[in-house]
């Protein structure tokens, strides 16, 4: 991992790895093959792994950890103090709250929101834990303090406020299990 100081920033700009008008903390740590678009804000104590692509207008707050081989689309917001695993895709306007753990191979489509509150609208002490291999439809909302099990599909505009079981398709407000996920529906196994 590198630390982004003044000299490193000059090198990155020279190689066109960084776009224009970024506000990046001097202690930003990053791996190889980093690409950063324009108009991003990366605050102190943020780390990203190898082969990470950050688009435009992204905000990464303190304590954000991003693994390898991730794609962070434009207007994504991380509230900080969260962990994002390897091979995770966060599409346009996704919000990752504090106290969220996202394991490997998860896909968040546009506008997905994770919430750092429990049912009583109080900040929860328990993390939102998203296990590996799930797919989240546009504008779905995932409440804090629950676990999304492995290989789930969460439908567009779903509101998930309870733990899920592995390999299920969930939709609705509140979300409920509709059926089992088929093997050919697992996004990360597609060519």
Task: List each language-model region with its residue ranges.
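Conserved G/P- and acidic residue-centered "switch" motifs that form tight phosphate/ATP-binding loops
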Residues: 154, 172
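Active-site oxyanion/phosphate-handling segment shared across diverse enzymes
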Residues: 155, 161
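Glycine-centered loop/turn positions within well-structured domains
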Residues: 158, 166-168, 176
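Flexible, glycine/small-residue-enriched loop-and-beta-strand segment within the central core
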Residues: 1-30, 35-147, 173-174, 181-182, ...
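Short helix N-cap motif at coil->helix boundaries in the Bergerat
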Residues: 162, 179
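Conserved catalytic segment of ABC-fold P-loop ATPases
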Residues: 149-152, 165-167
